[in-house]
Amino acid sequence: MVDGDTRPAVARAWIPLQPERAMQTPNDLPQPETVVVTATAVPARDLPVVGAALTIGDLPAHRDWLLEAPRDLELQSFVDAEVLNGDWAPAVAEARRLLDGHQGRLGIHGPFWGFTVTSYDPDVRAVVRKRLSQALDVCAALGADQIVIHSPFSTWGYNHRGLYPADAARMLDAARDTLSAALARAADMGVTFVLENIEDKDPADRAQLADALGWQALGLSVDTGHAHYAHVSTGAPPVDFFIRAAGPRLHHVHLQDADGYADRHWPLGMGTILWASVFAALRPLGPVPRLIIELRDKAGVIASARHLASLGLVR
């Protein structure tokens, strides 16, 4: 939780690496002393507890599971513009009723359809600022303290890095114009925005952008399926390197399985992600980020949690 404006006096300039070195290789990225690819013996009391990404409509079927342990929850009912522009107060009231007794941390997935947080169009940036402000309004009403937003980095942009030298500064200026007001308000509220990898090929890009913006109210999220897609389909490093590259800014992880071809959001164990390596990368980072199972079919959430428990990775 953040109290007030915690920006450093001078934010570090964000400068992408040269094209031939733009993406850090696995050897360049932060490494633990020992890379572990199989589950290690960790006392059960020290294992993390997983939560889930659900809509309000999914809560009744998962309420007992959510309340049996301090499970973190990400509500995904406040993503659409139609919802944010409408009367969402009844939805918040219903969520609060269903979550009575919930002891985990609460966040929301913020709006993302149709825009990026680094648009070069000032009119689009104005719309994005409005959407982020609306998301903060929802957090205030819900008592939530985290908002997931999407990374602006893409494979297209990565492959053209260096061809347009002004792009890095222009992107940073656009991000600052779009996000600064929301981050200032979030800091006052004790809310953290987390920037989720989408098409990111270089795991370090989001951390560099967050460092350049300089707000502690901006953290990072890693989506395991998105990272696996980037690894298999675009040549990015594997999922565990995305975890390590996020470092101390990692506040949130979307746990979903995939085959690396598409954004599957399969139940955990159905795809080809090496879960032992993911959790080995998480272990040295310190405070446990929110571990959020995010599936297309919510009926697989509890079974996915049990799968991780059977591997000795979570409680």
Where are these regions (language model features)?
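Hydrophobic faces of well-ordered beta-strands that scaffold small-molecule active sites
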Residues: 48-54, 73-75, 106-108, 147-149, ...
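Active-site beta-loop-alpha junctions enriched in small/polar residues
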Residues: 55-57, 76-80, 111-113, 152-154, ...
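Catalytic-core regions built around general acid/base machinery
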Residues: 91-102, 178-185, 277-281
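Active-site acidic/histidine proton-transfer and metal-coordination neighborhood
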Residues: 118-219
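Histidine-acidic metal/acid-base catalytic patches
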Residues: 14-17, 24-48, 60-68, 117-118, ...
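Non-membrane alpha-helical structural segments and their capping/turn regions in soluble enzymes
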Residues: 89-92, 122-133, 165, 169-176, ...
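N-terminal pre-domain/capping segments
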Residues: 3, 8-136, 140, 314-315
